[in-house]
Amino acid sequence: QSGGRVASDIRAQRRQVGIIFQQFNLVGRLPVLTNVLTGLAAELPLWRAVLNRFKTEEQARALDALDAMGLGEQAFQRASTLSGGQQQRAAIARTLVQGARLLLADEPVASLDPESTRRVMELLLALNQERGLTLIVSLHHVSLAQHYCERVVALREGVLVFDGPTSALTP
């Protein structure tokens, strides 16, 4: 909004926000690359998005995002063949292709094993530190927040109980 009015470039504004869900929201029968390319859907003509018609440069962008997530070799596999951690990394790659500057991550590691959790959290941290992306992450494990986050906003039954630097949290 601007002065109480919806901004004229609202679609461009929406593309700046990527969402990473607890459930990965990948289409299992489609290749990982195609799933990642769906991050471009908002900027493509409808017919191209529906028919999965992507330009070479768009595919290169998606392959770069998959490489950044350590999934370059899995690009042409069906998404259903990936482990949970790999699926979450593919979902993160989808937001990178989208060009998001703000990532909202809703319990991104809730259903992952400890090693996959570590890897996903380290990738999210790297996106923040190396690419300057802003991250808002919902977590239920305080230890993860203490290890990977600079600031914590804690709620209990919908009431704010803490808002400050991670260093101010006590175990």
Language-model features and meaning:
Residues 1-18, 48-56:
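ABC ATPase NBD coupling module
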Residues 44, 49-74:
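Conserved ABC ATPase "signature" region
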Residues 78-82, 86:
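Conserved ABC ATPase signature
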Residues 103-106:
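Catalytic Walker B motif of ABC-type/P-loop ATPase nucleotide-binding domains
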Residues 114-116:
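Helix N-cap at the start of a conserved alpha-helix in ABC-type nucleotide-binding domains
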Residues 118-131:
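Helical segment within the ABC ATPase nucleotide-binding domain
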Residues 139-140:
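H-loop/switch region of ABC-family ATPase nucleotide-binding domains
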